[in-house]
Regions:
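Positively charged, solvent-exposed patches that mediate nucleic-acid binding
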Residues: 1-112
Length: 112
């Protein structure tokens, strides 16, 4: 589970990140990133629609992504929204981890 200070909860934050942030996509998810002010910390939010699957599948995908994001809590001030796509439902955690790392490297938020 992500620490409470790193969880995005407000609808306005999700909307702001999705509309104004940098966007990177692959077949498993769409990543929206807004770089924040230094010292603001990292906020992470997840959206998993019904297109991904039933409630059990959606929660499994969300839990996997949340667990993967724990490794990236050292990212400097940013707002990150991960929107899961249907292909993420049948994908292993290791594949999702690799895909997410590639997107963070492309955005300059993680080292190779």
């Amino acid at each position: 589970m992500l620490p409470a200070v790193n969880r995005m909860r407000r609808t306005e934050d999700f909307r702001f990140a999705a509309r104004t942030g940098l966007r990177r996509a692959n077949r498993y998810f769409v990543l929206h990133v807004v770089e924040g002010e230094p010292g603001a910390g990292l906020l992470v939010g997840f959206t998993v629609s019904k297109k991904v699957g039933n409630a059990v599948v959606r929660n499994q995908v969300r839990r996997r992504l949340r667990h993967i994001m724990r490794d990236y809590l050292d990212i400097p001030a940013a707002m990150v929204v991960i929107r899961a796509l249907p292909a993420s439902a049948g994908t292993s955690s290791s594949v999702l981890r690799t895909a997410l790392h590639k997107e963070f490297v492309a955005l300059g938020l993680a080292d190779e």
